[in-house]
């Protein structure tokens, strides 16, 4: 099996790892209840999607 010829420096390792980042989720406001939700998904608060009620949500 092949082995590394040289040790990678801390700078090289750090430069590579600097691109590892988490993307913050994109949130949009629901047009019905104005709660933030993920785009292209049914609103968890009111159950509406694309102007139609798709899911019946029980009152809390």
From Swiss-Prot:
Q: Which NCBIfam families match?
A: rpmF_bact (TIGR01031)
Say if the entry is tagged with keyword Transferase. Answer: no
Keyword field? Ribonucleoprotein, Ribosomal protein
Official protein name in the record: Large ribosomal subunit protein bL32
Say which family it is in.
Belongs to the bacterial ribosomal protein bL32 family.
GO BP terms, alphabetized: translation
Question: Known SUPFAM superfamilies for this protein?
Answer: Zn-binding ribosomal proteins
Q: Which domain of life is it from?
A: Bacteria
A molecular function annotated in GO for this UniProt entry is: structural constituent of ribosome
Annotated GO CC locations: large ribosomal subunit
């Amino acid at each position: 099996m092949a082995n590394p010829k040289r040790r990678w420096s801390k700078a090289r390792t750090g430069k590579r790892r600097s691109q590892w980042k988490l993307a913050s989720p994109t949130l949009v406001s629901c047009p019905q209840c104005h709660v933030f939700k993920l785009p292209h998904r049914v609103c968890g608060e009111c159950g509406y999607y694309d102007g139609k009620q798709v899911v019946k949500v029980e009152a809390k």
